[in-house]
Amino acid sequence: MKKQDISVKTVVAIGIGAAVFVILGRFVVIPTGFPNTNIETSYAFLALISAIFGPFAGLMTGLVGHAIKDFTTYGSAWWSWVICSGIIGCLYGWIGLKLNLSSGLFSRKSMIYFNIGQIIANIICWALIAPTLDILIYNEPANKVYTQGVISAVLNIISVGIIGTILLKAYASSQIKKGSLRKE
């Protein structure tokens, strides 16, 4: 098996991605009225970074970005959700491997594939894993954390489904389409 190094491009993407994740997570959220649960624009951006740079970049951007956001907002990290931000970034990256965005294509079929994948990933992460980790790590009440998890999953599905799809389409549209250049 060939050893695969992490490129400078990926490291830079993780750093910039984490910084933008923090800014969006701190300043571009819409409160829902349910405690510690907001409409987050940062996950739509995480989907973009993950789809472009892959699962590892998504994992690290989610982990680092969410940890820094929590430390700068609350003074400490809520590790169960930080872990899930990394997992969701990794899952978005795996979904993105099949999208072929760099060739300038993001067809209706690709949009459907992306959205089915992100719906499944968000349900797994936010409605199942995050609340379960809250119970195991912090001994939180199950009814509270599963309610938060389901609400977060639904809100992230909507945010990523709308904003994330727009970002992916805009990125793909900015790429040179395969076969569009001809030698004269």
From Swiss-Prot:
Cell compartments where the protein resides: Cell membrane
Keyword Cell membrane in record: yes
Membrane topology field: Multi-pass membrane protein
Pfam families (UniProt xref): ECF-ribofla_trS (PF07155)
CC annotations in GO: plasma membrane
Record keywords: Cell membrane, Membrane, Transmembrane, Transmembrane helix
Superkingdom, natural source: Bacteria
Chief subcellular location: membrane
Entry's transmembrane regions: 11-31, 44-64, 77-97, 111-131, 148-168
Family: Belongs to the UPF0397 family.
Name assigned to this protein: UPF0397 protein SaurJH9_2709
Lineage start: Bacteria, Bacillati, Bacillota, Bacilli, Bacillales
